[in-house]
Amino acid sequence: MVLNKKITILQVLPDLNSGGVERGTLEVNKYLASKGHRTLVVSNGGRMVRELKSDKGEHFKLGVGKKNLFVIFTVFKLINFIKKNKIDIVHARSRLPAWVCFFAINFINKNNSPIFI
């Protein structure tokens, strides 16, 4: 399949410190950015943010991996973030971020909601 349209992809994970999920996030970011797509990552930050940005990725700090009652507010922040940035695809890379993304996407109008993987 050939994509002529440039898309905006959001990857969501708890943090960008070290590990397989984090490395995979950077690899996907690098590949998609090299093809001209806009890639965004939402996490609580970490030492790999600099590498992400050097590969043309954009990072936004949001505590999507924190297990507490305030995660409800994170859902609403993510809804606004997705709408504002016109996200086409959301890729959740961990369990808690997946639930946060699931609830956020279900609050968005079905005609405007991104693909969730």
Regions found by a protein language model. Name each.
Residues 81-88:
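Glycine-rich phosphate-binding loop signature in dinucleotide/nucleotide-binding domains
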Residues 92-98:
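Short His-centered aromatic/hydrophobic patch
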Residues 52, 101-105:
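Hydrophobic packing residues within well-ordered alpha-helices of enzyme cores
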